[in-house]
Curated annotation (Swiss-Prot):
Keywords: Cell inner membrane, Cell membrane, Membrane, NAD, Quinone, Translocase, Transmembrane, Transmembrane helix, Transport. Pfam families: Proton_antipo_M. It comes from Chloroherpeton thalassium (strain ATCC 35110 / GB-78). The keyword Hydrolase does not apply. This is NADH-quinone oxidoreductase subunit N 2. GO terms for cellular component: plasma membrane. NDH-1 shuttles electrons from NADH, via FMN and iron-sulfur (Fe-S) centers, to quinones in the respiratory chain. The immediate electron acceptor for the enzyme in this species is believed to be a menaquinone. Couples the redox reaction to proton translocation (for every two electrons transferred, four hydrogen ions are translocated across the cytoplasmic membrane), and thus conserves the redox energy in a proton gradient.
Length: 512
């Protein structure tokens, strides 16, 4: 029977809302920005195609300022323990804003996004803003219900954006496949949540930790629930065996959305995975201790298989977007190596790598968009002679691919170095993981460098050397991302310090 809340409970709820509102300013602002973009789209304004992306970019940058102000808030829980503000969440919010801003910017010159048969641009850009909002919530969620709702919010928006090109069969097919895979993974995850709730009677992850430390529950059931939850997070992060959606979705989606999913969605998945497992794993050694299960071995196997499968299958890909999809699976494996370490050094390496991956992967996809605009193809074999036709784009893409491989002097090299160093510092047991990481990076050299091989060492079939006319804004953005890739490879201290300061997670424990 429904019970009317008491005056004290109502007062407590109002107090929680008032306290939480001050910590929720970035999310409130993004909600307003979403409504503003939708509203602008309702009016017949001649320059609407310019105004909407401009408003979106400016709004996202302003939201970054509000995130910056959160540094002054002591790490704490808000909204009755459903939402946290801590350095860890703030770091990911910066990452989501950067990926969102560049998703908007690279969409401006994308021919496929601006096709006449495409949906409303206001709808497109407002959904990018809404997705940033959803990822904000994912990074700060400290309650099973909030985790599920925020992940579903991001997933549903992703389904729409992947199928944005309604006039193209491959986009609609990619959207449908994404919905099917996403629905299955969401079902698995919510079932895992229900098992954890059934065992503990709690949805707050800190309360779950406390319950498991002081009470006995069935270990097998607990492991089953945790594995199902891992499946849900793994789907968003794109690790094996939850990767099946990646190749088809990356190939069929509009390229700016492919770039956005490859960095923003992946980072959000890892944010939830790291927070959940570093907080809910209790430090005790009782029969219900999650550490009674060898999580390190399980995650190590997932990481190794992701690195091997992603890099090996990419060897046979001729479509650039599909190639980078398998590359993304491999990089998810590298990132997972830092998660396995599960201490501050490992978390720092993970955060640094995610930031590095955001820069170099968005840069690579941006160049692919510019090339596709000119030649109308994503096939590697059609890249012949582009070193002369698009000199800046070709040089930049080569730098991004060098960074994705993990070679100096790029930020990708520093990222992998930090991951492998964290593994070696953890102990000799983890050396084999670092060795496999290095070997799979060597394998990636082949499929990454067949792209520059075509651009510089093979002539185009038409024999033409006439340069394509790429816009000034596009060239400036590509050059900026290329410079960041090299500069952070040579002078990585600012990014490393930011990652180091962002490892503080409320209630986190170390997995031994």
């Amino acid at each position: 029977m429904f019970q009317v809340p008491s005056a004290g409970e109502i007062q407590e709820l109002i107090g929680a809302l008032k306290t939480g509102a001050s910590a929720f300013v970035p999310e409130i602002f993004l909600s307003g920005l979403f409504l503003l973009v939708v509203t602008i789209d309702l009016f017949r304004i001649p320059s609407k195609r310019t105004i909407i992306p401009a408003v979106s970019v400016i709004g996202l940058i302003i939201s970054g300022y509000f995130v910056y102000l959160q540094h002054a808030i002591p790490p704490d829980e808000f909204f009755l323990g459903m939402y946290a503000v801590d350095p860890f969440a703030i770091f990911f919010k910066y990452l989501f804003i950067v990926s969102g801003v560049f998703a908007v910017l690279i969409s401006i010159d994308s021919v496929e996004v601006n096709l006449p048969e495409s949906r409303s641009l206001g709808e497109y850009y407002s959904l990018i803003v809404a997705m940033v909002l959803g990822m904000f919530l994912m990074a700060s969620s400290t309650d099973l219900l909030m985790m599920f709702l925020s992940l579903e919010m991001v997933s549903i928006i992703s389904y729409i954006l992947v199928g944005y090109l309604k006039g193209q069969v491959r986009s609609s097919e990619a959207g449908l496949k994404y919905v099917i895979y996403g629905s299955v993974s969401s079902g698995l995850m919510i079932y895992g949540f229900s098992i954890i709730y059934g065992l503990t009677g709690e949805t707050n992850i800190f309360a779950i930790n406390e319950f498991l430390k002081h009470n006995e529950v069935d270990s097998i059931t607990l492991m089953l629930g945790s594995l199902l939850i891992l499946g849900g997070f793994g789907y968003k992060a794109g690790v094996v065996p939850f990767h099946f959606w990646s190749p088809d979705v990356y190939e069929g989606a509009p390229t700016p959305i492919t770039a956005y999913l490859s960095v923003g969605s992946k980072a959000a998945g890892f944010a939830m995975l790291i927070r959940f497992f570093r907080v809910t794993i209790p430090t005790g050694a009782g029969s219900t201790d999650l550490l009674a299960f060898d999580w390190v071995t399980l995650l190590s196997v997932v990481s190794v298989v992701s690195m091997v499968l992603g890099n090996v299958v990419a060897l046979w890909q001729s479509n650039v977007k599909r190639l980078l999809a398998y590359s993304s699976i491999a990089h998810a494996g590298y990132i997972l190596l830092g998660v396995i370490v599960a201490d501050d050094l490992g978390t720092q390496a993970t955060l640094f790598y995610l930031a590095a991956y955001t820069i170099m992967n968005i840069g690579a996809f941006f160049v692919i968009i510019l090339i596709s605009n000119e030649i109308g193809s994503d096939d590697v074999n059609d890249y012949k002679g582009l070193g002369k036709k698009m000199p800046l784009a070709a040089a930049s893409l080569t730098i991004f691919l060098v960074s994705l491989t993990g070679l100096p002097p790029t930020v990708g090299f520093i990222g992998k170095l930090m991951i492998f160093s964290a593994l070696l510092a953890k102990g000799p047991v983890f050396v084999w993981l670092a060795v496999i990481g290095v070997l799979t990076s060597v394998v990636s050299l082949y499929f990454y460098f067949k792209i520059p091989l075509n651009m510089y060492l093979r002539e185009s079939e038409d024999g033409s050397e006439t340069e394509f006319n790429v816009g000034m804004l596009s060239n400036a953005l590509v050059a900026f991302l290329m410079i960041l890739t090299v500069v952070f490879g040579l002078y990585f201290t600012p990014l490393s310090v930011l990652a180091e300061e962002s490892v503080k997670i409320i209630g986190a424990v170390v997995m031994n």
